[in-house]
UniProtKB/Swiss-Prot annotation:
Residues 1-22 have a biased composition (Low complexity). InterPro entries: ZN622/Rei1/Reh1_Znf-C2H2 (IPR041661), Znf622/Rei1/Reh1 (IPR040025). This is Core trichothecene cluster (CTC) protein 15. Pfam families: zf-C2H2_2. Glycans are attached at residue 254. It comes from the Eukaryota. GO terms for cellular component: preribosome, large subunit precursor.
């Protein structure tokens, strides 16, 4: 009995000695988020704009003109209506470079990719090395299609009578904005990973240039200012607003007398909004009717083909 007790005490002592001899493992004092910070990838460096650099491949030309010829022959990029551009070609291609290399978006459909090479491959593979200059496009801000013959004959005169400076160049307001010589501000929202739906929404919600009111000088400033507010004809309107007013007046003239009388109590802006909404709804109805008619014609052609197939004789005559 005494021997068993002695053996047990010896075993306990040996175990305590082993535990005390085990080296202490140092605690991990590294912050939990250090691995996350170290593993996070650095943002992709945006290449600076070079006039001779192709937007879709690594080929570099000596001048911008040679690069434009290469992009047109190799990739199909064409700049239409260059006479109506409000900026020089270098500034326009600088904005295209911003869209592709900074925001990694397709020029044609607005599809976003994670890298520049991916969006370049998308555009070359889909044939999207082009851009839209329609009214609802963001590239329409670089064009001015509404110059009248009088404005073209005046040459170097602005709307307010001041002389134009042909050497004026766009100003880079910040990394995402550019002010054109006409006073328009072209900006791109900082959404490098934006979805195509956000791109389409940005195109639809593109803001227009506010109206600029002329401020007369003289002793009767208050009287003239009140007259300008009451009469919109004295305001300096943009060409787009003039065109919208002319279109609304044309559509209003084509309405019946009853419809025009029903709109007389509304303001001019409300009339234009209502006419535009009605026009869009009419166009949508026409498209739906045409689509339904095509489906009906297609179904009729299938039934006619099946009918004549079954009417053929099973066995040849004779």
């Amino acid at each position: 009995m005494l021997g068993a007790t002695t053996a047990t005490a010896t075993t306990s002592t040996a175990a305590m000695t082993t535990l005390s001899a085990t080296p202490n493992v140092p605690e991990d004092t590294t912050p939990l988020n250090q691995d996350i910070v170290e593993s996070s990838k650095e943002p992709e460096q945006v290449a600076s704009f070079t006039p001779g650099q192709c937007l879709f491949c690594p080929i570099t030309s000596s001048t911008l003109e040679e690069s434009m010829v290469h992009m047109q022959k190799a990739h199909g990029l064409f700049v239409p209506q260059q006479d109506h551009l409000t900026v020089d070609l270098e500034t326009f291609f600088r904005y295209l470079h911003l869209v592709i290399f900074n925001y990694r978006e397709c020029l044609h459909c607005g599809t976003s990719r994670s890298t520049v090479q991916a969006v370049q491959q998308h555009m070359t593979g889909k044939g999207h090395c082009k851009f839209d200059v329609s009214e609802d496009s963001e590239f329409a801000e670089f064009y001015d299609f509404y110059q009248t013959e009088d404005e073209l004959s005046e040459g170097s005169l602005n709307e307010d009578g001041s002389s134009k400076d042909p050497d004026r160049k766009p100003l880079q307001v910040d990394q995402d904005s550019m002010r054109l010589p006409s006073g328009r501000l072209i900006s791109k929202k900082s959404s490098a990973q934006a979805e195509p739906s956000l791109f389409q929404a940005r195109r639809r919600l593109r803001t227009t240039v506010p109206q600029i009111e002329s401020v007369p000088t003289g002793s009767d400033d208050e009287v003239d200012t009140s007259n300008e507010i009451s009469t919109p004809d004295t305001q300096v309107l943009t060409r787009r607003e003039k065109r919208q007013r002319a279109t609304a007046a044309h559509q209003l003239a084509n309405m019946s007398a009853g419809d025009r009388a029903a709109l007389m109590h509304l303001s001019s802006s409300e009339q234009r909004s209502l006419i535009t909404t009605n026009h869009k709804f009419t166009e949508k109805v026409k498209k739906e009717e045409a689509r339904s008619q095509r489906r009906l014609d297609k179904k009729g052609n299938k039934n006619l083909y099946a009918y004549w197939n079954t009417e053929n004789p099973v066995y040849p005559c004779g």
